[in-house]
Amino acid sequence: MKTNAPTVSPAAANGDKTSHTAKPFNEDVHGATGYTLGSITPSELATLRGHIREQWLYRLQLVAPEHVSKFHAVSMDQYHTVSDLVDHAQIWPKTSRVLPESAIRSVRAMSFFKKLESEFGEITIGDEENFGWENITWRLVRPKQKDVGPIHADEWFYEVRPTQKKHTGRIPVKIWMAVYCNAGKNGLRLVEGSHRRGDIYKYRSEIRNNLAVPVFDGAEEDLPLTIPATNPGDFIVFNHFLLHGGVWNNENTTRVSIDFTIFVDEKFKK
């Protein structure tokens, strides 16, 4: 069996985000590659980290008050050094990692979001958890642990879960952003151009935790995977049909990222 080791995107490896953001996001998202890159400012990254850390500590205050001081003493990228004090798998369901409305308003005020709005016009952020407000979810991926997402296309979830909410006359576009990350080593992996090859990239549906989950029906090691070299504050805007998944974290820090789905006018679909 052939093995394709993931490659680091050359432009991203050189830290070149300008070539991606100088032209419209949509040109690449619905173009040949299916994705594009950009960055937020250092002050915006600090603000975002503050929102996530506040919710992270509040959750720990609720489930493990006796250990909160130990978590408070470390940066989130060092979470793994004290994570054995809690039951990681039990205390971090997705519903506990959705930012509150106040943080969503803060993200919407950031320069990168204003750029998205200047191109796409009115944007709605998805509410996958049906909380009643827009959902931006953060993730913790500890070193050398199996808590990374498998290869999939987000569109598959709409196909296996008919009740998943879409918006009439609008199309979904995905945003993934590195909050704490080592460029090209523990971020996001993807298959360039796969959004146009639904004829060869198939999936099967499995029931996990009483929910239908789409699973790539093939060998991941045979995929031509690319790892864009995302530093903290870098983001990827990508097509909802693009194959992607988390990178195995072989570094010595915890990866923290956010992701969310925006809905834009269907006229942007090529």
Question: Can you describe what each PLM-predicted range is?
Answer:
Residues 100-103, 221-224, 246-247:
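Active-site rim elements
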Residues 235-237, 242-270:
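Non-heme Fe(II)/2-oxoglutarate
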Residues 36-39, 126-137, 178, 187-191, ...:
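A structural signal for short, well-ordered beta-strand segments and their strand-loop junctions
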Residues 103-106, 229, 249:
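Exposed beta-sheet edge/beta-hairpin loop segments within beta-rich domains
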Residues 115-187:
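Conserved double-stranded beta-helix
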Residues 143, 156, 180-184, 195-196, ...:
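Short, solvent-exposed loop/turn segments at secondary-structure junctions
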